[in-house]
Amino acid sequence: MQISIFAVGRMKSGAEQKLVQHYLDRFSKSSGAVGFHLKKLQEIPESRAQTACQRMEEEGRKLIEFLPEKCQLIVLDERGESISSAAFAEKLGCYRDEGIRDVIIALGGPDGHNEQIRNRADFLLSFGFMTWPHQIARILLTEQLYRAVTIANHHPYHRF
């Protein structure tokens, strides 16, 4: 199963970008054993429209353009469900076992996702009630992807 991250905005060079790459590298080295593969991290340009509504619409259109025809779409959204790391690993494992080929995980821009993206989502995921800067949300996501692989591999990184 191929997993891609579609993120609105560019990750600037620095410690955050290095940490994202660190977790993506660890994920890639460990994920093949459980049938997960990192396909790509697709950055979608942040809209420069004047209103939040216009920005979300423009970013949503761009995101839809990049989506494969058949994919499972997980959208990070404050309205989403907060689940445990083990439940996230189980969800990914279920997608794999169901023969899902492509899983896309979408991170919105500063204004979030529009209703069209939320409605298209197969699962809305939340990292809790707090608001996270985009860079930290990417770090959290990549760490959780790596953690999901370690859970599936029964690796001690995730303490059971």
From Swiss-Prot:
Its EC number is 2.1.1.177. It catalyses: pseudouridine(1915) in 23S rRNA + S-adenosyl-L-methionine = N(3)-methylpseudouridine(1915) in 23S rRNA + S-adenosyl-L-homocysteine + H(+). CDD domains: RlmH-like. This is Ribosomal RNA large subunit methyltransferase H. It comes from Bartonella tribocorum (strain CIP 105476 / IBS 506). Pfam families: SPOUT_MTase. Keywords: Cytoplasm, Methyltransferase, rRNA processing, S-adenosyl-L-methionine, Transferase. Transmembrane segments: none annotated. InterPro entries: Alpha/beta_knot_MTases, RlmH-like, tRNA_m1G_MTases_N. Homodimer. The gene is rlmH. One of its GO terms (cellular component) is cytoplasm. HAMAP family: 23SrRNA_methyltr_H. It is found in: Cytoplasm. S-adenosyl-L-methionine binds at residues 76, 108, 127-132. GO terms for molecular function: rRNA (pseudouridine-N3-)-methyltransferase activity. SUPFAM superfamilies: alpha/beta knot (SSF75217). Belongs to the RNA methyltransferase RlmH family.
